[in-house]
Amino acid sequence: MKFASKLFNKLKYLTMIVLVTTVVSCDSWLDLGSEDRIMENTLFSSQAGFMTALNGVYIELLNSSLYGGTLSYKTFDILAQYYDCDKDEQTWQKLSTFDQTAKKGQVSGLWSKVYTLLVNVNTIIEACDERKEVLNSEYYHVIKGEALALRGLLHFEVFRVFGPIYSVDPETECMPYSESSDLKVRPLLKASDVARLMMDDFKAAEELLKDYDPVIKKGALWGDEGPGLPNDMVYRSLRLNYYAVKAYIARLALYTGDKATALTYARQVIKETQEDNNWFPFVTRAAATTLSKWDRVYKTEILFGLYNLKRSDVYESTFSNKLGEKVILRPTDANIESLYEEDTRVNDWRYTEQWMTLKDPDGNEKKHFVKYMAVDDTEGPDDNKVSQGYTYLMPVMRISEMYLIVAECSNDEAEAFDHLNRLRAARGVAKANQALGLSRRAKR
């Protein structure tokens, strides 16, 4: 196959090229397990092959340099000093104090992994058109739409770390934008140009998905909710679906100061997924509290998440009460309490259900973060078993962020407080005092 030959000739020399461009940790194409591999020369000769390639990208998002660590609970939370890493012998002490060597070692992995993965993403995008005859219309629009969204998302994560403070200096040259699978060294672009290209990718993805993504008419499609649909088109929360793409447009617009666009898209996502339909409802009190050992990640609210079969390892290797002080990541009890309002924390489901007082190896009782603790699939009502995915989900984008964007961007104070209080109610927290809005407006 001419296309496959061209693809793997490119990848043959990937290690040499990325070393020149500082991308130093090249993996083989998608690095899939044997059960998900197909022969190289048939990769894009079938719809199944396209899905294998795309699934491989989603799998790689769980790499420790991406959402399997750095971007979810580790590197930047350590740098933000959320955790108690003060002791010299603590594994993360140097990183928490901005030691340059430690910081470079952690952050460079993000840059390397993203630009390596972008070669794969761009290859899929190109294949969608070069091998278009292989795909029916639905698969073409969904696969290319998701791949373009992935390209925007991967660049956005690098942009947030390596880009300037956008409101201060949007013309600073900060990073290249990878739009091709060729391995040419690309120049650093101005932040404003990177932002434009990311938005172009997200908007193109939105356009491709809007008439073809099953999420629009049928919702997230967990489990048996998608009869008649191929497996590739269900579990839409585990893909960059249409509503997740719109949410990223809102996030990027807010990041770059375009509050009007951010507000428009956040409103649309809320209206289309919670008001007109019930596709991504807030977690119920029963699921969050009565069945507290089940849904600690608020599955129904996740617009985009990743399925991590080893998620319990996150807890066991990072947050478990069985770990010693040298390796555990744990805030002080005082810092934990400071994250939640004093008057309402006793009712806040995030505080009462995601933190648990447990004995450490020395027998001292301390609060531990149990959001990612393993879920036992041998107990509980059938409709709350692990088959629903609670124990494997790593959240990436939630519907709740859209409420916060509306609250921040709306010039209508009543609308802003309504959205803020709807979100607070969905966490068991009392309404905010609208009188505070006077100071809110004064700061604008």
Predicted regions and their residues:
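Short, surface-exposed recognition loops and adjoining beta-strand edges that mediate ligand/DNA contacts
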Residues: 70-83, 164-171, 215-317
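Elongated scaffold/linker segments in the mid-to-C-terminal portions of large proteins
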Residues: 268-419, 425-426
